[in-house]
Amino acid sequence: MPDRPVRTRIAPSPTGMMHIGTARTALFNWLYARHTGGKFLLRIEDTDRERSTDEAVKVIFDGLKWLGLDADEPPVFQFARADRHREAAETLLARGGAYRDYMTPEELEAEREVARAEGRVVRSPWRDASPNDAPDRPFVVRLKAPQEGETVIQDAVKGEVRFQNKQLDDLILLRTDGTPTYNLAVVVDDHDMGVTHVIRGDDHLNNAARQTLIYQGLGWEVPVWAHLPLIHGPDGAKLSKRHGAQAVSEFDSMGYLPETMRNYLAKLGWGHGDDEIFSDEQAIAWFDINDVVSAPARLDWAKLNHLNNHYIRQAEPARLAELVKTVLASRDWPLEAGDMAVIERTIPFVRDGAKTTLELADNVVFALKRRPLELPEKTRTQMTEELRGRLSRLREALAAVEYWDVPSLEAALRAFAEAEGVGLGKFGPQLRAVLSGGAPAPDLAGAMVALTRDESLGRLDDALSPSA
């Protein structure tokens, strides 16, 4: 382990979406930096100029901000450092760790055919040629990888991983136009940013061997490698569109809270005993990259929904009201003055069963409906004179309730049912429909407290009017 303060990084490419796997990688880097008192850094690998638009970069910034993963230093943009990457390639050339390869495309294809037939990697005849023999034609710069022995990776997650050097080709460092390739740029940037721990998906494990050789060729300290298991779908297959959401923005729009995602993503490959729910502070105190398991993690929607319900029940109603407002706006639901107060007042009564803020929005709609409410057809057919009389007497009993709170209203409903000599089932469903207009609603007492005395009695009056 490097004898210096921990510096981790997340280095996404701006592709237009922030994948949930990238989010998990960012979280693990952030947690380990916070756990060790180190720094968490951000680099944008924007060398693909066609895809690296300002909008695509903003998606990354927005995703990290939503997740609450704050970088400790300004972001580094890889494309702007191309000169530094070329400088490192020149250093490797000067040290004999790289060479200029003048093979034409036709020669390269012929060598590939021979290498394939012989079961070996491609080797350029220019690997050991004298620079004095160089022709006047385009060239690439290749790493001069060792051809014998092994390159050994000590990985914090995978353990010791060995690569046979004879199976490692002389990877290209600079293309014919002088632009750097991924593996060179990553090594140079990580070194210059002082990155001590490279924590990333295990689809990069093979790159670790190649990058180790570049580090060694430049005489730089190799960082600690930690390659995280991939995230699979519930069926054990690699996560794909058929499993549902993949992007951070999709989980946001589906009504999941960022604290839910931090808690849930932390459990994908890491855990602390039997603890399923833990705060950011607990995760930071407990997290160690050496405790991450190497087996793929499976996305479990039931667990995610359970967690989200927990955090919805813990969140401040005012914050949830703003989230519900956003959901309703996306549905073109018109909000009027005073509606935010109604939403905030209603949330404590309807959130216990809500798995997402979308469901929470569904559950508050009853309180936002404008009078007079349209009763469900079933309720209208049930409004006999007998039921109207009973609801009218109930209205008077409710109007006499001194304290408009859940215990008082529950007591009033029980007393009324007893006085009428019937069970609550004889009028409760119809009262619920009168109060909610058929929309999802909480228990009767909770619904009436959310609506307030005046609104509840007003909705009863509307239902009992001759024109109803």
UniProtKB/Swiss-Prot annotation:
Coarse class of the protein's main subcellular location: cytoplasm
Listed GO biological process terms: glutamyl-tRNA aminoacylation
Compartments where located: Cytoplasm
EC category: ligase
Recorded GO MF terms: ATP binding; glutamate-tRNA ligase activity; tRNA binding; zinc ion binding
Cross-referenced InterPro entries: aa-tRNA-synth_I_cd-bd, aa-tRNA-synth_I_codon-bd_sub2, aa-tRNA-synth_I_CS, aa_tRNA-synth_I_cd-bd_sf, Glu-tRNA-ligase_bac/mito, Glu/Gln-tRNA-synth, Glu/Gln-tRNA-synth_Ib_cat-dom, GluQ/Sye
SUPFAM superfamilies attached to this UniProt entry: An anticodon-binding domain of class I aminoacyl-tRNA synthetases (SSF48163), Nucleotidylyl transferase (SSF52374)
Functional description taken from the UniProt entry: Catalyzes the attachment of glutamate to tRNA(Glu) in a two-step reaction: glutamate is first activated by ATP to form Glu-AMP and then transferred to the acceptor end of tRNA(Glu).
Name of the protein described by the UniProt record: Glutamate--tRNA ligase
